[in-house]
Design a protein with these regions (language model features):
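Short secondary-structure boundary/capping segments within folded domains
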Residues: 25, 41, 62-63, 283-284
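Basic, low-complexity segments
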Residues: 1-57
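Trp/Phe/Arg-rich N-terminal binding region typifying the photolyase-homology
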Residues: 36, 52-67, 74-133, 144, ...
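Anion-binding and metal-coordination hotspots
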Residues: 84, 103, 107, 115-537
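Secondary-structure junction/capping motif
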Residues: 22-35, 64, 158, 274, ...
């Protein structure tokens, strides 16, 4: 199938729009379909997806990519299934108007079109490591930001856990399911007699459920032993060795063999039906699945999600912060919570001219008066204490400052109660690491009203994870695996952005009308006042 741009967007003589009454046309133009048709659909970049199709122009041309992409956005906006979205396109003129298909004799989407399009994107990502959906949605967000005049000088970030749709398994279930899947995938004629029992209908229930607690460790050892024998038996078979089932079996044995339950790593296999899902405990909640990161640019009136990512849930917020710093422009202010922040990350950001503003710090925000000591960080010397006394001597070694102060100054100092200097035999010792000093300085800075006013602006992004869960059902997706889940996440992000654009344009239009009306009224009143003054004279 060859790639072809969608050029058939002109109205035909038989276009159903021409048969609408004035009232129907007015309602259509005041619906969501109008801004989607004029401000969203025309800016979908079809060329980006040409790599999914054949370069041979003699082959059958593709159906319009921008219609697939636009319909997938509408599917998320209205929380529909593929079938419901297709039916809406077939019978709802608003969908056809939004996607410029009113003049088509047949709507160019069939039962499996959306599934096949997503599958093509998955395969391309697996082969080349390029997410075409993410590229398009992030480019789309930049265009929307320009339309709403969001400068993007200030951004905020937040992350959320995304649950896998796979079932939570016990350790025995993980081991058994992996071994059983491998056995069912190979040729039954080559399977040794001792493993034939795994093919029996009741073998799973007999192994997993019909057992006492004291039998559990024995069963785990037995199934692991069976898995190890299978691995040794088929490891020289090149075809089987390349299969997904053999790779999962090898991975499971490496992660589970010879280890107690407490020593199993969080990144270990949680369910063979979703190899990408990992385990993480965040706060008091346990999660199996992935973690998503959101980057939002905003101003006082509008917001736009300009970037996103999805990884296994063992991926930390600090890694997301490092990834984000690489893509941000100089002069950007980034509002984050404490999980994203570290001194090393702040230094990387500063080197690029990016300002990191944490709203809190991991481990709490308790402070001493250490930052009130005057310290020359270039010369690495403690100059004087908060009371103005110079140290007897000062050193800097292995990233820490050490300064000794005279007892006669410290013993009766009015600041002694809050001072971090430690009483010793001959002097008072002030000791602080460079990292702790910078933390104290930051905590003091975080207490200022100017800093708090800026930090409060981060709260606006915290509603997005809730919306993704409640409205967009991000924890109940029909697919598994990072690549597939990320595609669904991308269209949900695009749906949020499109709704924000439509709302933002409507608000701006209303504001412009209000301004025009106000100016008109002012001109009338101004004329009346001038006339009255002349008449009085």
């Amino acid at each position: 199938m060859s790639f072809q741009l969608n050029k058939a967007q002109q109205m035909a003589l038989h276009d159903p729009l021409l048969s609408l009454t004035e009232r129907e046309r007015k309602h259509l133009q005041h619906s969501w379909a109008e801004p989607f048709s004029k401000k969203i659909f025309p800016y979908i970049t079809e060329d980006r997806f040409s790599v999914l199709y054949s370069a041979n122009p003699a082959s059958r041309p593709n159906n319009p990519v921008n219609i697939y992409f636009g319909l997938l956005i509408l599917r998320e906006i209205f929380n529909q299934s593929d079938e419901e979205a297709l039916n809406s396109l077939l019978f709802d003129i608003r969908y056809q108007y939004a996607l410029h298909t009113t003049s088509f004799a047949e709507q160019p989407v069939s039962k499996n079109s959306l599934t096949n399009f997503r599958a093509a994107v998955y395969r391309y990502n697996q082969k080349h490591g390029i997410d075409l959906i993410q590229q398009e949605i992030e480019a789309q967000a930049k265009g929307f930001s320009k339309l709403l005049k969001i400068d993007g000088k200030t951004i905020r970030m937040d992350s959320l856990m995304v649950s896998s749709s796979c079932r939570k398994l016990s350790r025995l279930e993980i081991i058994y399911s992996t071994v059983s899947r491998f056995i069912k995938a190979i040729d039954k004629n080559t399977l040794p007699e001792r493993f034939q029992a795994y093919l029996e209908e009741n073998h799973y229930n007999d192994t997993i459920y019909r057992s006492r607690d004291e039998d559990l460790n024995g069963k785990i050892k037995k199934v692991l032993k069976d898995g190890l024998r299978l691995c040794h038996l088929y490891r020289k078979n090149k075809k089987i060795k390349q299969s997904e089932e053999f790779k999962l079996l090898s991975r499971m044995l490496k992660e589970q063999q010879g280890k107690s339950a407490k020593k199993i790593a969080p990144h270990s296999l949680q369910n063979p039906t979703d190899p990408d899902a990992t385990y993480r405990k965040k706060g008091k909640k346990k999660h199996i699945g992935y973690t998503a990161n959101l980057i939002e640019k905003f101003d006082d009136k509008n917001q736009m999600i300009e970037g996103y990512d999805l990884q296994k849930n063992t991926y930390s917020d600090q890694k997301f912060a490092e990834d984000t710093i690489k893509r941000l422009a100089e002069g950007t202010t980034t509002l984050v919570d404490g999980a994203y922040y570290s001194e090393e990350i702040a230094k990387k950001a500063e080197a690029k001219g990016i300002k990191m503003v944490p709203t809190n710090l991991v481990g709490g925000g308790k402070n001493s008066n250490a930052d009130q000591f005057e310290i020359d960080e270039k010369e690495h010397l403690v100059i004087k204490c908060p009371s103005g006394h110079k140290p007897i001597h000062s050193t800097f070694k292995k990233g820490s400052y050490r300064a000794h102060f005279d007892k006669k100054h410290c013993s009766h100092c009015p600041l002694r109660k809050d001072c971090s200097a430690i009483k010793q035999k001959k002097s008072y010792l002030f000791r602080i690491s460079e990292k702790t000093l910078h933390r104290c300085q930051l905590i003091t800075k975080m207490g200022t009203s100017q800093y708090q006013e800026l930090a409060r602006k981060r709260a606006g992004i915290e509603g997005i994870p809730s919306a993704l869960r409640r409205r967009y059902k991000i924890d109940h997706l029909p697919v598994r695996g990072v690549i597939r889940v990320k595609v669904y996440l991308g269209f949900k992000i695009s749906a949020i952005n499109c709704k924000r654009l439509i709302k933002g344009l409507a608000n701006r239009h209303n504001l412009e009308l209000s301004t025009l009306l106000c100016d008109h009224l002012l001109s009338l009143f101004s004329f009346q006042r001038t006339y009255q003054v002349k008449f009085a004279a």
